[in-house]
Amino acid sequence: VELRSPAKPTSTLVVLLAATGEEGFWLRRRFSNPLLARGFATLSLENAFYGVRRPRGQRVSLLRTVRDQFAMNVATVQEARAIARWARDAGYDRVCLTGFSQGGLMASFAAALTPFAVAACPRGAGDAAAPIFTNAALSRRIHWARLSAELGSESRARRYFEDCLKPVRISRFPAPELAKAAILIGLRGDGFIPAAEVDALHRHWQGAELRWLTTSHVIAAAFHSAAHQRAISDSLSRLPG
């Protein structure tokens, strides 16, 4: 992890979870500078299977198996929940769980499963994982030929993979303790996250706010940081105290 604190003492912490394939902290370090200027501390988590936590034999950030993907996601959610508990015990009265893309999905799960009020700001993320990996742009990163060899055909491999991912849906769980302290950012030109999945998460988290940006997944991450940072700040302002 990398914990950064502003010049003056603060009781506010923003937990930044990694996007797909994001190793190290330099992107989130740059993103966090305006948050530090607002008086917020930030904590970035290195995912299991990424960066210094890669298992032996894994090259770069590409995961080798479906099992590794599930293991990484479960670890990220559990670690984010543990960080939220640690932060509360350490004197941070306001905590926001946030991330972009995969990080947003994991932040949503962690916020929903945290038994006390936290702010949440999932950015470029939706309700379910299956459409991301089977229908959207990220499906091109999956080695369908290898899965097809094991299961007999690509169509059978896709159905099997979709069945495996069906339970990975935030709406299976209750909304966060204080849903009004959640702000979702959806992207109108997103080739990775279907708009229907963003709407589904918003409907499930009754009381949350949904803000749309008219841009693509990659452009939103690279050039719309100010909108993301405003949403994080606004979500924190909706926590009590």
Residue ranges and their predicted role:
Residues S5-L13:
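Proline/glycine-enriched tight loop/beta-turn segments at coil->beta junctions
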Residues V15-V74:
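Cap/lid segment of the alpha/beta-hydrolase catalytic domain
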Residues R30, F109-L113, A200:
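Active-site signature of alpha/beta-hydrolase-fold catalytic machinery across serine-
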Residues A75-D93:
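Conserved acidic catalytic loop of the alpha/beta-hydrolase fold
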Residues T98-A107:
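Gly/Ala-rich beta-loop-alpha elbow adjacent to hydrolase catalytic centers
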Residues F109-A157, W212:
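Hydrolase active-site cap/lid region
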Residues S155-P240:
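Serine-hydrolase catalytic core
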